[in-house]
Structures are given as C-alpha cells and as structure tokens.
A protein has these predicted regions:
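An acidic, glycine-/histidine-flanked metal-binding catalytic module
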Residues: 37, 41-89, 96-102, 213-294
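Intrinsically disordered, low-complexity terminal tails and inter-domain linkers enriched
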Residues: 4-55
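Terminal, regulation- and interaction-focused segments at domain boundaries
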Residues: 148-154
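Accessory alpha/beta interaction modules
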Residues: 133-138, 150, 161-162, 184
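Short charge-dense sequence patches
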Residues: 71-81, 110-119, 145-147, 203-216
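Active-site acidic/histidine clusters and adjacent loop/turn architecture
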Residues: 79-125, 130-140, 147
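Long beta-strand-rich cores associated with HINT superfamily self-processing modules
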Residues: 142, 155-264
Length: 294
C-alpha cells in the first residue's frame, strides 16, 4: 500500500473537529502548550482585526480562522511523523539486540556494552531548519534532517564497531544513505566515532514507511570523551577554555592509543588460548544451552 500523503499548505483543507481536538489533547506530549497555541491563534486573528478594521468581515475572519486551524493540522502531521520516527528507533534497536544476542551465543561475548536512543527535540529541529533557511514543515524535516531519530551503540573494542557495522549493513532491508568514519579520520578536536545514516522499513497498520535513522557506533572510552566535550560545547564563558580544548584533544589521542592497546591485548589472549579438545567443545556446547539470552 502506498504511503499517505501530507498537505502542509496553510491554505489547504481544514482538518475536522475530531482531528483538531485529538491534536490539542496530545500537544503536551510533544512539548507544546495547547493553551498557549490557542491564545496565539486567537490573538493573531483578533489583533489583525483590531489593527485593520477594514478586515473585520465574516469572510475574512473565516479565512483567517481556517488558516489557523490548518496550522493545527500541520501539528497533527508533525505528531504523526514523530510517532513514526519513534517506531523506527524500536526497529533499529531490535536489530542491534538480535546481533548482540547472536554474538553472545556464537563467540561467548557481547560486542555491545549498551545502547541509547533519542528523538531530536522540536526546538532543535526548528533551529537546524532555520540554519538551512528552511521553513518548519513535515516535508523539510523528512528531506533535510537526517538525525531526527538517533541510536548510539557502545562497544568494548574498536574492531567490534566495524563487525557490528558489517553485520547491520548485510541485512537486506537496511539501506546505507551516508557513512562518516571519524575513527580512521578524527575531527580536529579529537572526536572519534563511526556515523551511519540508514533507511529501514517500518510496517504500520495500513502502510510501510522507509524511515531514516542516524547510527553512532563508538567504544566506551570514545563515548565518555564525547560526553565531556559535549558539555564544553554548550557552556558559555568558561575560564581557560582554549587550554581545556587542547587538553581534551590530547586526551582523545591517549584514549585512542588505549583502545588500540586493549584490543591488541585481547587478540593476544585469544591467540594464546590452546585449541579445545573434543570433550571440551562438547562441554562448552552444553553450557551454551543454559546461556542467559536477556
């Protein structure tokens, strides 16, 4: 079944009362205040009528109220879009959970330490569109914002990052849109991580929708460095900021060397382990029957 189409033209058809009431009931969940929105819409109409008495006609008032209601219709569409991105996060997280469980059974260890997901806040989406000189609309969000839905996968070792990436991209329903490897080519400030933009299908009750998700894969050490650097980025007027930036960059290099050494030590341990006997292999298989898959 084809995707539902959306109309964001403020002069387009006005949603029914049921749709408007439903959107108002759910606005608080979106971080919007329905009372404030109602005041803004009513105030806009009344303010224009007061400033321009010639506009005070039934036809003009109806037209302006129609546009205001259409704006609420756009909010309804935006709410639906956020729901679809939230579902996309559930789908992509399930894929990583399955891979982690498989690795645990096949290789007796989990390459993924933990997973975080997030939906970009409305104000952040609006600011990003503004920087691109784009209007706030469902179409612009889908076309120009790649990181509305984001998932961060934290691994123990650097080679786990690429193993997880390879396993994900082998899946037939995962389409790679963009890849940026900041591990092999770090940012000037020392930031390291693997970034992917992928498209995955999400099946809803009446249609299927291809949704974009930003995937960040990094080690535990890369992640705690990035968390501290993120704090610095959004703090204003920090004393000795240049010195802190330089020290963070140096720490990034040290963390990278530590990640490499830890991975090499693991490889040496694995290489130095003697080949198991047939009885040991059988015992290991029996133990795996009781493995905790949670």
């Amino acid at each position: 079944m084809t995707d539902k189409t959306h109309n964001n033209d403020l002069t387009g058809p006005v949603p029914g009362n049921a749709g408007v009431e439903a959107s108002i009931e759910n606005m608080e969940a979106m971080g919007l205040d329905p009372e404030n929105l109602d005041m803004i819409l009513n105030g806009t109409v009344e303010g224009l009528m007061s400033d321009y008495p010639a506009l005070r006609t039934d036809d003009t008032a109806d037209m302006m109220i129609s546009k205001a209601r259409s704006l609420i219709g756009t909010v309804v569409e935006y709410e639906e879009l956020r729901m679809m991105y939230a579902c996309a996060l559930k789908e992509i997280k399930a894929k990583f959970d399955v891979l982690n469980t498989e690795f645990k059974v096949r290789y007796s260890r989990n390459p993924i330490s933990f997973i975080n997901t997030r939906l970009k806040k409305t104000v952040s989406i609006s600011e990003k569109l503004g920087r691109k000189n784009l209007a706030f609309s469902v179409e612009n969000i889908e076309k120009h914002i790649n990181d509305v839905a984001g998932i961060r996968v934290i691994c123990s070792y650097v080679d786990d990052i690429y193993a997880i990436e390879e396993a994900l991209l082998k899946q037939s329903d995962v389409v790679l849109v963009c890849r940026k490897d900041y591990i092999s080519a770090p940012k000037p400030n020392g930031y390291r991580s693997l970034h992917l933009i992928v498209k995955i299908p999400v099946h809803f009750a009446e249609h299927k929708r291809e949704m974009k998700v930003e995937v960040q894969i990094r080690t535990i050490a890369m992640d705690f460095w990035a968390s501290l650097e993120h704090q610095l980025k959004y703090k204003q007027e920090i004393a000795m900021q240049e010195e802190i930036v330089e020290e963070l960059r140096q720490c990034a290099d040290i963390i990278n060397m530590t990640d490499e050494r830890m991975m090499n030590i693991r490889h040496r341990i694995e290489a130095g382990t003697k080949a198991p006997t047939e009885d040991e292999l059988m015992f290991e298989k029996l133990c795996k029957l009781d493995i905790n898959l949670e």
